[in-house]
Amino acid sequence: VIADEVQSGFGRLGQGMWGFANYGLEPDIVTMGKPIGDGHPMGAVIVRPKLVSSFGSNTGYFNTFGGNPVAAAVGIAVLDVIEGEGLIENARTVGAYTGELLDALK
C-alpha cells in the first residue's frame, strides 16, 4: 500500500496526523511534500525497512539535496507549530463548520 499524503498529511484532515490512519491502513510507503515545509521546498518518502534495506547497498543511489540541515530545521519547526498551536483540532473545527455551511446550500 502506498499512501500519498502530499495533500492530506500533517493534520490537514483534522483527524490525526495522517489521512491513511482514518481508514486503518498501514502503508508500506508514505509520500509527503508541501505541508512538511509549510512553503519551504521539501518532501519525503517513508518506506518500511524491509522494502528499502537492500536499496542503498545494491544501487549506489545518493541525493545531493538529502539531509539538508535548513530543511530539517524547517520540518521540525513545522511540527512544533502544528502541536503548539493545536492545528489538527483547528482543522477539525474549521472543517466541521465548512461542512455545515455547504450542507445549508443543499
Question: What does each of the following model-derived ranges do?
Answer:
Residues V1-K106:
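Conserved N-terminal phosphate-binding loop of PLP-dependent enzymes in the Aspartate aminotransferase
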